[in-house]
Amino acid sequence: MRELQKLFDRIIQRVNVNLREHNYDVNPFVQNLIPADKMKKFYGFYGITPYHPLNFQFRHSNLSGSHFLGKCRVTNSLLYKSDIRGDELKRKGDLFQYQDFQIPVDADEEIEIEESFLIKTLVHCFSHDPETLERFFIRDTISTHYTNIHGSPINGSFLGPFSTIDLTTMRDCVIGAFSYVQTGEVNHLNIDPGTVWIRNPDEFNFLYRYPVDRLNNYIYFAKGIPP
């Protein structure tokens, strides 16, 4: 239990360092979200099929109640009842189409989770970032209940409950509850709860925010209060 607490504190500190420009402290939001005894109550599960590479590594991590499929690596992380689906990862020899480029994939793609805390989070699809074709990474990140990370490498971010990051590389961002972001890339932003933002550069930019007073009737997340 002591090691779990040390790892938990380490992850919080790393996320806070990444979010320092927002003056955002994740600690009050994540304390007591998951009782510590539940983190040691459940097993982790790894799926084996004849169609996906058998490659799973985890080190200094807790995988309580989480499911994994495909090529995955977890380091210094806490996962609680999360689904890490590697069934759509790119394979060595594939060609990735990006704009006018056809980029060859040099190795089987891997989901890499490092220094992160994922709570009931779904991670699936594959990295759509042409700069990281073989690595679908989630680093120094905390995601809360029912977050959906769809083909989106993430570094140094905090994701509120019921938020979705879709086909977007994200660095050093805060994503409010019940938000949907599909913009290709976002950096150093604090996105309000209930935001729907879809952008294709030079094509369109759609932005909508649910009224907070109405949103709070359905999903409310604040310091010290579980969603």
Each model region followed by its residue ranges:
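Terminal amphipathic alpha-helical/low-complexity segments used for targeting or macromolecular assembly
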Residues: 1-139, 146, 151-153, 162, ...
